[in-house]
């Protein structure tokens, strides 16, 4: 398990933790609204759309925490709602399939974080008069990036949970296993 300095800094910056840990610790970078994690402050309130890199970046393409994972096959954008829906699908499947065993041994890591605000103008508004207000958050995903990692579960359960989560995501994904 090899982590670069950049990936360690990103994990520290975005504090990839569960909702209960966020509410207990009161971190400065991550804020909780319902069950959704998003940055508390950004340098600018509005960003440009930008382009998703088509090439595969070496950072974040290997499993770093769990035994199984979900990897993106294409570059694109993931909304904070899609990330949360996929996370809930994985947890829901594990709770149904394994009952109390998942609570004792199972663990999930979310390796993507929606940190870019998306803006939108209200309907029936004329052109001009500046950029719209922030309406949501997205994460840019590159080809081959690990989205979720799982550990403490069987291969069959992990594969089925990855299939359920893939239906919630707007990117094509594949199931990977640590070797």
UniProtKB/Swiss-Prot annotation:
One of its GO terms (biological process) is mitochondrial translation. It holds the Pfam family Ribosomal_L16. InterPro entries: Ribosomal_uL16, Ribosomal_uL16_bact-type, Ribosomal_uL16_CS, Ribosomal_uL16_dom, Ribosomal_uL16_sf. Its main location: mitochondrion. Keywords: Mitochondrion, Ribonucleoprotein, Ribosomal protein. PANTHER family: 50S/60S RIBOSOMAL PROTEIN L16, LARGE RIBOSOMAL SUBUNIT PROTEIN UL16M. Component of the mitochondrial ribosome large subunit. This is Large ribosomal subunit protein uL16m.
């Amino acid at each position: 398990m090899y982590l670069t300095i950049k990936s360690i800094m990103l994990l520290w910056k975005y504090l990839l933790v569960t909702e209960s840990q966020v509410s207990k610790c009161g971190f400065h970078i991550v804020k909780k609204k319902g069950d959704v994690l998003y940055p508390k402050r950004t340098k600018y309130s509005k960003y440009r759309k930008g382009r998703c890199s088509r090439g595969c970046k070496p950072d974040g393409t290997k499993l770093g925490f769990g035994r199984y994972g979900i990897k993106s096959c294409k570059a694109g954008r993931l909304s904070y709602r899609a990330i949360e829906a996929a996370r809930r699908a994985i947890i829901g499947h594990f709770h149904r399939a394994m009952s109390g065993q998942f609570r004792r041994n199972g663990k999930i890591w979310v390796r993507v974080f929606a940190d870019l605000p998306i803006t939108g103008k209200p309907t029936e508004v004329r052109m001009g008069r500046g950029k719209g207000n922030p309406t949501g958050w997205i994460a840019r995903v590159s080809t081959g990036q690990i989205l979720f990692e799982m550990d403490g579960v069987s291969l069959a359960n992990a594969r089925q949970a990855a299939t359920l989560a893939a239906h919630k995501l707007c990117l094509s994904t594949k199931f990977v296993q640590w070797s």
